[in-house]
């Protein structure tokens, strides 16, 4: 089979890179993205590797760039992204980059510090301006006799009796508006009502110099008598984080201070504007290049991380690396190494040497933007074992088709297809926007899956003749009512029977099968569900058994490729016979009944369920039991016996043959050391047995070929028993599992019909002049519920059930999924802006 149906052939290669050329060679390999480096220093601490200092320098540059990016985003300056892929800087360029980033960071920090100090000063002056303005209003109000009478409680009765002049102290300040009620209660309780508080709101919010948020504040002035109350008031103000400001006692002094404050505010505003302009210029200049800087720094960091995976030659002049790479890309890798050597100016070429190993290579399946989503569906279950059959090419068709069987509705399929087509046509623009919405990104990555699901849903919707729960009368119904009146229907028959059944046996009633799909007359029939359930149930069984048989057939190609004849003789053959003897025969019975009994003889059609149950019970009653065909009893008994014989065939033969092979090897005293045979030479049959065992052994961790392990017949027998039981019971449970195709299709059709009947049908029934307006609102509700329930919820449900059918019922027949993914060293994720390591 071609590479499309299997993972790429991989090889382990050793790279010898000259120290001065290693950086450029790894850079070229990163641009190519076809090699996966192995860590040759697993026992060496990360902080003790050779290039750890360079990695730290790159991380420090990355930190500075993140700081600059944060400031750019805070200033709402758009970051320019031209899609440019800059070349990796040379190691000597790191000093210039560090100096440039250091300069920008220090300049921004200095600007921010100065700006924060200026804003703090500006805030204080602004608060003082409002204090002077509001306190003047307070003092003007103090001349009011009513207010003076209100504040008279601040004086002791003895002082009032002696006529002591009123000498009140006061403090003025600003506090957050939401703290005023609590602040007022605290003053009243602590000072026992011996203070007088006046407060007024500042109309405009003030900017916090630290956070940049706008805060609503209020001006307050507190009158008191005595130093003790003064200390209490100041402590309370300090606890509530109120800002206190000096306020002159005379109106003239307050007026002069206000004039000076306004002048200073104007001067400070001018300086702040100039500072902000300078900051904007610095950030705008950085915004033009920051994406390029990010890519350069992170490419350098990735290169040094990769170089830390290499071994250093004892001469300190050569780096040794081991990489996994596809065999088909060896030439391009060699070319990349030559290009890297030329860029570095080295005269000694880098060497790539293929290595022989018994380690299991990583699994690498080439994909494009169309197959990427389907490959992800397979990989979500498990990464395929190296070189085993890849289910993704078949999933491209089977997955959307099984989804459509459950989702089949022509109208809903059109909506889904239109949405997918919109994403496909605008994919370039959407990719360039780099949408960070995770849910939309997930849906967009599966746009081609959704496209095929929509197209197949349109196809199955036409088969079901279902469009928003209504049938399409394209070719005209094949059923006619007129012949029924010709034979036995009368006016009295119509009046006395609310439900009448057409007799297809009468000439002219049934004109033959509908040209395509289901006859639209069934949409208004009262026994519609009975007919559709029978059809969809049988269809689900047929599709399920064909799907599983296809999966078992694919296992044959795996056994042939891995040269495992025992798995063919004692695995594939009995498995395929077991399934076809029982469930393949059931499919044949379904098709036979469809062809043997037409509309005229349907009354005599026997029940397949009864026949299939009696087949296992060997029960064939003499009376009241009609055979489907002659010789049915003998054929069915033979098939059941064959299926039963397949169970010990799968269970016993393979362990016994493996035990016999082990005893023969042990008797011959033959060992194999790297291909050199010692002892009595085995026969040709024994050589094939040894080869089969070696090819069946895959070790991911062992660096050297392992010796023949001791054969444990008990473990082998238990493992084979588990596999046999799982397969035999799985054939039954998996076949039943495919009935979800029928169940989900029924649920979708019923929900669609309920929506039409309970929503849009009511809107269409309004006959008044306001019917158009009513229909508008009902249609809006119908469209919303259709998208939310039938397209999204039901679509997601059908999607998950299709996943289950592929992962469990299909892939477990041939797909082990125990491999590990090929993760090449590549700069692609850096170019796309995905910087997470």
Swiss-Prot record:
GO CC terms: clathrin-coated vesicle membrane; cytosol; endosome membrane; extracellular exosome; ficolin-1-rich granule membrane; Golgi apparatus; intracellular membrane-bounded organelle; lysosomal membrane
Compartment(s) of residence: Cytoplasmic vesicle, Clathrin-coated vesicle membrane; Cytoplasmic vesicle, Secretory vesicle, Synaptic vesicle membrane; Melanosome
The answer to whether the entry has keyword Ion transport is yes
**Positions of transmembrane segments:** 389-407, 410-426, 442-471, 535-554, 573-593, 639-658, 725-749, 771-809
The reply on keyword Glycosyltransferase is no
Provide the residues annotated with a glycan attachment (glycosylation). 488
The record places the following residue ranges in the Cytoplasmic compartment, namely: 1-388, 427-441, 555-572, 659-724, 810-837
Q: Name one GO biological process term.
A: vacuolar acidification
User: Outcome of mutating residue 527 to D, per the record?
Assistant: In NEDEBA; uncertain significance; impaired acidification of endolysosomal compartments
Q: What does this protein do?
A: Subunit of the V0 complex of vacuolar(H+)-ATPase (V-ATPase), a multisubunit enzyme composed of a peripheral complex (V1) that hydrolyzes ATP and a membrane integral complex (V0) that transports protons across cellular membranes. V-ATPase is responsible for the acidification of various organelles, such as lysosomes, endosomes, the trans-Golgi network, and secretory granules, including synaptic vesicles. In certain cell types, can be exported to the plasma membrane, where it is involved in the acidification of the extracellular environment.
Disorder association: Developmental and epileptic encephalopathy 104: A form of epileptic encephalopathy, a heterogeneous group of early-onset epilepsies characterized by refractory seizures, neurodevelopmental impairment, and poor prognosis. Development is normal prior to seizure onset, after which cognitive and motor delays become apparent. DEE104 is an autosomal dominant form characterized by onset of developmental delay and drug-resistant focal and generalized tonic-clonic seizures in the first few months of life.
What is the protein's given name? V-type proton ATPase 116 kDa subunit a 1
Q: Source species, please?
A: Homo sapiens (Human)
């Amino acid at each position: 089979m071609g590479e499309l149906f299997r993972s790429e052939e991989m090889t382990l290669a050793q790279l010898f890179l000259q120290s001065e050329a290693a950086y450029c060679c790894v850079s070229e390999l990163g641009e190519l993205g076809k090699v996966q480096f192995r860590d040759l220093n697993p026992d060496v601490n990360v902080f003790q590797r050779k290039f750890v200092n360079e990695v730290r320098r790159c991380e420090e540059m990355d930190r500075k760039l993140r700081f600059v990016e944060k400031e750019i985003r805070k200033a709402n300056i758009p970051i320019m992204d031209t899609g440019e892929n800059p070349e990796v800087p040379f190691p000597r360029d790191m000093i210039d980059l560090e100096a440039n980033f250091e300069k920008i960071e220090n300049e921004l920090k200095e600007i921010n510090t100065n700006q924060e100090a200026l804003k703090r000063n500006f805030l204080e002056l602004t608060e003082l301006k409002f204090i002077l303005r509001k306190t003047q209003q307070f003092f003007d109000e103090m001349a009011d006799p009513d207010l003076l009478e209100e504040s008279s409680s601040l004086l002791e009765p003895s002082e009032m009796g002696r006529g002591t002049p009123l000498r009140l102290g006061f403090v003025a300040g600003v506090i957050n508006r939401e703290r005023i009620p609590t602040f007022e209660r605290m003053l009243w309780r602590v000072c026992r009502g011996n203070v007088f508080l006046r407060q007024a709101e500042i109309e405009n919010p003030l900017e916090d110099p630290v956070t940049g948020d706008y805060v609503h504040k209020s001006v307050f002035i507190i009158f008191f008598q005595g130093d003790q109350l003064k200390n209490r008031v100041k402590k309370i103000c300090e606890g509530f984080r109120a800002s206190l400001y000096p306020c002159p006692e005379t109106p003239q002094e307050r007026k002069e201070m206000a004039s000076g404050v306004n002048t200073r505010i104007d001067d400070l505003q001018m300086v702040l504007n100039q500072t902000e302009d300078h900051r904007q210029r610095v950030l705008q200049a950085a915004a033009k290049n920051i994406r390029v800087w990010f890519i350069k720094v992170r490419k350098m960091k990735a290169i040094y991380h990769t170089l830390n995976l290499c071994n250093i030659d004892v001469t300190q002049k050569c780096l040794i690396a081991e990489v996994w790479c596809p065999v088909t890309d060896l030439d391009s890798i060699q070319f990349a190494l030559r290009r890297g050597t030329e860029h570095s100016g080295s005269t000694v070429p880098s060497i790539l040497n293929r290595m022989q190993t018994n380690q299991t290579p990583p699994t690498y399946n080439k994909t494009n933007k169309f197959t990427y989503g389907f490959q992800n569906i397979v990989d979500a279950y498990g990464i395929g074992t190296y070189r085993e059959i890849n289910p993704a090419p078949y999933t491209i068709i089977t997955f959307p088709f099984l989804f459509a069987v459950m989702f089949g509705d022509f109208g809903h399929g059109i909506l889904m297809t239109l949405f997918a087509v919109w994403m496909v046509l605008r994919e370039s623009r959407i990719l360039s926007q780099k949408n960070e919405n995770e849910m939309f990104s997930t849906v967009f990555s599966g746009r081609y899956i959704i496209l095929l699901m929509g197209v197949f849903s349109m196809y199955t919707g036409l088969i079901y003749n279902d469009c928003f729960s209504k049938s399409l009368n394209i070719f005209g119904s094949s059923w006619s009512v007129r012949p029924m009146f010709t034979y036995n229907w009368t006016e009295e028959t119509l009046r006395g029977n609310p439900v009448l059944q057409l007799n297809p046996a009468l000439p002219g009633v049934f004109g033959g099968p509908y040209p395509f799909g289901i006859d639209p007359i069934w949409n208004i029939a009262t026994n519609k569900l009975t007919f559709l359930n029978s059809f969809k149930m049988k269809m689900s069984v047929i599709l399920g058994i064909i799907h599983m048989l296809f999966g078992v057939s694919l296992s044959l190609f795996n056994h042939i490729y891995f040269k495992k004849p025992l798995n063919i003789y004692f695995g594939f053959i009995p498995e395929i016979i077991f399934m076809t003897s029982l469930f393949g025969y059931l499919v044949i019975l379904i098709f036979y009944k469809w062809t043997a009994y037409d509309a005229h003889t349907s009354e005599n059609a026997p029940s397949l369920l009864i026949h299939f149950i009696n087949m296992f019970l060997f029960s064939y009653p003499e009376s009241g039991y009609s055979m489907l065909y002659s010789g049915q009893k003998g054929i069915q008994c033979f098939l059941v016996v064959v299926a039963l014989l397949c169970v010990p065939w799968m269970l016993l033969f393979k362990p016994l043959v493996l035990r016999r092979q082990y005893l023969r090897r042990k008797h011959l005293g033959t060992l194999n050391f790297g291909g050199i045979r010692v002892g009595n030479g085995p026969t040709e049959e024994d050589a094939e047995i040894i080869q089969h065992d070696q090819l069946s052994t895959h070790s991911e961790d062992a660096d050297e070929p392992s010796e023949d392990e001791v054969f444990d017949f008990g473990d082998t027998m238990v493992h084979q028993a588990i596999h046999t039981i799982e397969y035999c019971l799985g054939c039954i449970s998996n076949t039943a599992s495919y009935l979800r195709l029928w169940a989900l299709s029924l649920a979708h059709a019923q929900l669609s019909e309920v929506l039409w009947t309970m929503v849009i049908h009511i809107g269409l029934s309004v006959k008044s002049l306001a019917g158009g307006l009513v229909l508008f609102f009902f249609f809006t509700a119908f469209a919303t519920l259709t998208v939310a329930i039938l397209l999204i919820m039901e679509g997601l449900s059908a999607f998950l059930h299709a996943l289950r059918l592929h992962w469990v019922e299909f892939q477990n027949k041939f797909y082990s999924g125990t491999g590990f993914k090929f993760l090449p060293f590549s700069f692609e994720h850096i170019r796309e802006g995905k910087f997470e390591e």
